[in-house]
């Protein structure tokens, strides 16, 4: 997974040739930490088809604010330089993440 910051967000997400999943998380977010190993497994499964990336909001608040992330966990799904889907809070399940990744293909 690619760690995103304000310096590389545009290049890695908006300008990506591949569809992109962006995982907004925080070290004190229990649900975020619980999902992390499964998201890493998905990243391996979809390697070469979908780019998986993450934003630690504790270290990159500006990125979270710019993307209007209001709670954690939040997953954004980008394709062709635009956000096409978003799931956050209690709506975030591994199944929902997988559904949205499949929709990017």
Which residues make up each language-model segment?
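A short beta-strand-turn-helix
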Residues: 2-20
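Thiol-based oxidoreductase modules, predominantly thioredoxin-like and allied folds used
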Residues: 3-4, 24, 36-43, 47-62
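Short pre-active-site segment immediately N-terminal to redox-active cysteine/selenocysteine motifs
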Residues: 17-18, 25-28, 71
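Short, thiol/selenol-centered motifs that function as redox-active sites or metal-ligating centers
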Residues: 28-35
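Structural micro-motif
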Residues: 61, 67-76
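Non-catalytic, surface beta->alpha helical segment in thiol-disulfide oxidoreductase systems
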Residues: 76-105
């Amino acid at each position: 997974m690619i760690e995103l910051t304000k310096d590389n967000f545009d290049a890695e997400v908006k300008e990506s040739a591949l569809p992109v999943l962006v995982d907004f998380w925080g070290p004190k977010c229990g649900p975020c930490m619980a999902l992390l190993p499964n998201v890493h497994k998905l990243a391996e499964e979809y390697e070469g088809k979908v780019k998986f990336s993450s934003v630690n909001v504790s270290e990159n608040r500006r990125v979270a604010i710019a993307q209007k992330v209001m709670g954690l966990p939040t997953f954004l799904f980008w394709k062709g330089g635009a956000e096409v889907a978003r799931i956050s809070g209690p709506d975030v399940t591994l199944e929902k993440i997988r559904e949205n990744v499949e929709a990017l293909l």
